[in-house]
Each structure stands twice: as C-alpha cells, then as structure tokens.
Swiss-Prot record:
Reactions catalysed: L-glutamate + acetyl-CoA = N-acetyl-L-glutamate + CoA + H(+)
SUPFAM superfamilies documented for this protein: Acyl-CoA N-acyltransferases (Nat), Carbamate kinase-like
PROSITE patterns, per the entry: GNAT (PS51186)
Protein name: Amino-acid acetyltransferase
Family the entry assigns: Belongs to the acetyltransferase family. ArgA subfamily.
GO molecular function terms attached to this record: L-glutamate N-acetyltransferase activity
GO cellular component: cytoplasm
Chief site of localization: cytoplasm
Cited Pfam families: AA_kinase (PF00696), Acetyltransf_1 (PF00583)
Keyword presence, Amino-acid biosynthesis: yes
Keywords: Acyltransferase, Amino-acid biosynthesis, Arginine biosynthesis, Cytoplasm, Transferase
Amino acid sequence: MKLRSTALVKGFRQSTPYVNAHRGKTMVIMLGGEAVADRNFGNIISDIALLHSLGVKIVLVHGARPQINQLLEKQDCHTPYHKNIRVTDEYSLGVAMQAAGQLQLAITARLSMSLNNTPMAGTQLNVMSGNFITAQPLGVDDGTDYCHSGRIRRIDIEGINRTLDQGSIVLLGPIASSVTGESFNLLSEEVATQVAIRLKADKLIGFCSEQGVTDESGNVLAELFPKDAKQILERLTESQNPAEDMSTGTLRFLKGAISACRAGVPRCHLISYKVDGALIQELFSFDGIGTQVVMASAEQVRQAQIDDIGGIFDLIRPLEEQGILVRRSREQLEQEVHRFTIIEKDGLIIGCAALYAYPEDHMAEMACVAIHPDYRDGNRGQILLDYMRHQSKSRDIDQIFVLTTHSLHWFREQGFYEIAVDELPMEKQGLYNYQRNSKILALNV
C-alpha cells in the first residue's frame, strides 16, 4: 500500500481555487538574462509550461544583459552606459543580436521539451516569436548618442492576443526593428512593462535575485501599494550602486511594477529566480512567497453575506472548542450573519467580528472576534475594531462593550476599560453567564 502524503493533499486542496482563478488570465513574465543563466532556469521553464497547461495565457519576455556582456568581454570590447542604459553602437548591436538570438532559441527549446518525462508528454506546446514590437531610437541625451539603443514605438496587441487565443506562448526579446528596418536594443524591463500595460494583463511577474522587496529587518514585504513601493525604490536607489542592480534586477523590476500597477495592471509580482518553485508558490498559495505591488489589497473588509456562513463557521469553531468563544450553531449564524463583518483574502475568511446594537441604551456589543491562526501577527484585530467603531458612530452608538475571557490585555491596549455587569444594557444583564465569568470592558466611541 502506497503511503499518502498529507502535505501533498492539503497543498493540492489549497491550490485548487487559484487554478480556477488563473485559468484564462493573461500574465506577462519577465526573465532577465541573469535568470536564464541561473542553474534554476530549467525549473522555471517547467513551471511556466505548467502554468500554460492550466489555461494561463503567457507572454514571456527575456533579457540578455549578462550574455551580451560576456560576448563583448570575450572580444575585449567594452560599451559605455549613460543613465544605466547601454550605448549600443553598430558593433555591439551585432553582439546583442547574437546573444538575444541564442537565448530565444534556447528558451524555445526548453519550453518545447519541458513536458517530456511528465504525464503530459506528447502535448503540443507552441512558442511564437515575431515582430510584435516596433522600435524607435532613444536619440541623444545630454550630448550622449544612444546609437542603436531604442524604445518602444508600437506594440501589435491584436497580433499578440490572436497568438495567445490560439494557445501559444508568446516569446519576446530585447531586440526589435523600426519602421525603416533598423534594429534596436531595448530594455527588457520596459518591454515587459509596456506589453503588460497595453495588453491589459492580469499580472506582471518579474524574476530577480532577491525574494521580493524586504524591510530594514530583512523581512519580505508581501504587499505594497505603488506609493509605498515608490518610497522604497527611492531609498534603495540612493543606497545601492547601479552596477549592483545590473546583477540583481530588483530595482529595475520594482520600477516597472510601479508603472504597470499605476497604469491598470492589477497585480505585479517580484520573486526570486534562485528559489525552486517560486512561481508556483507565489501564484497558488494563500500568502505567496515574494512581493506584490497592488492598487487594491488582496484583503477585503466587508459585511458578511449568507454565502459566508460556512467560512465563518470554520473560522470560529476551533475557538469555540477551546472555550474562547461562546458556541454558535449554524442556524444561529444564518439568523445573525447580517451582524458580522469579515476580512476576506482570496476567498478565505481570515477574520470576523459581530456587532449587536442596543439602540435605546446607545450601546453595542462587539462579539465573536476571531482571526485565522496564520494571520494573527498583523493588525487585523485593530482593523475590525475600527470598522465596528465606524458602524457604531453611524448608528448613534456612544459605547462599545466586549465580554472576554482570554483577550483582556489586547482590548486594554486598544483603550477599553473594565465596567460592571449592572452597567450593561438591561437585556444583556439578563443574559450574562456568571459561571463563564467573562471580563466586561467598554470603549467610548
């Protein structure tokens, strides 16, 4: 009899909602030349092929910066940079075209063989490259002629969409032609960012050497709004040598993520190309593994609805079994669901609280406060309390009270103070359980 892996079963169950959510979505994935050169590159390609097999529409953009540098060094040729952009002369353009062409063939070959030795062996995976990008020269800046370094002039969005709808992966590189037939070397980060924006992609995903963006203590910041990300970008730009970012890519990707998010791409992810399975962990788990730059948080605070009863029930049941919360039947939840406020993340209810108003006394009880065990290190309790206070003010409530047996200190930290049973509304006094002996605390709204 084969041993069954509980972790595998649990992981598969948790990932199922994301499989359905991502199917049919368009994702632009940016692979810098550093990622292509890393030993984990083969695993990244396998994960991209897996995404494609799950119905995700993929545009893969690759860079070639280290490969170009390597070829130039072999030929004892060095190109200058101006404002962190390579000045591509006639000779280095030929080298760039050679490096980009080799990478395009290598990536195509890897994708084509990525499903070998898997249950999906024999499945056709088409990779399409083409003249989807039209370039134009960067021109002269502060007296420096960028020569064959260029920028995007036009993107054939209809052509890309048509190719994606046919079931192919679109592969784009850093070399593009102009309307006059000249070739230009583009910033791959700009290509990925602009394609994601104009394609109205659901996600932009960038691989860098670091596992996303970290705070000053080295902890990965799971979620950033563009404004906060911009401040971090400015701080890192001041402290980091531009040459260092040439090898890590964090600043380049973060800059692109901010631009894309502000232009309407809902979620932009930064993950590490050094971590095996980072792409899968980021897209198919509750918390991900890297950093998201988002316009709207993945967590939503809202009034509970009838469809939320099952999630609320699952959240509070362990606390009821421990005696922390008073037991509520499913029938009671159905009758009182309109009193509940929930915090929802990707379809999972991770927090809840209920408000029971006593209008004649201008008081309200905040009850059934619960936070999912995996999310108790944040400020979600404070968020629920603030929501309760806002509701109370709008309903002419002057005071919120709670009955607690385990969270006395937390409520005191929020400004609650102890009151006696006879200070409760008369209706609540008659329901007070002296055997449970809960502490009663109040907060002036």
